[in-house]
Amino acid sequence: VHNNVVYLAGQLAKENGFVKNVGRVTEQISVIEAERQMKICAQHAFSWLEIAAKDNNCYIESILDLKVYVSCDKEFDGISKIADKASEFFINKLGDNGRHPRSVLALTRLPQNAPVMIDLRASLKLK
């Protein structure tokens, strides 16, 4: 946290400490599974935001921006649909304050061979 902004990097969809299903979307991972994992990434990120807010006697004011990474082959064109799951999660949690600008990037490989990952910045406000 710096100047009431939380910087979260590299949120993977870990379950019981590790990424359960690995590989590229449409090769080893279905779009449905990628969407499920994207929601888990968002849930983990939101949990970290809640901890940061509590530790700083604040509440989560808004999501400032979101970066979504999808590991897939070069022909796959559905990365925005997968990213929508994270965006929807934050909007459901924070209402209009969950709306955010977003970048969505397709890559050939992510850490731990995860299919999806997110980074974000969020603002906190003193209670």
Model segments located where?
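Short, polar/acidic, helix-capping and beta-turn segments at strand->helix junctions
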Residues: V1-K127
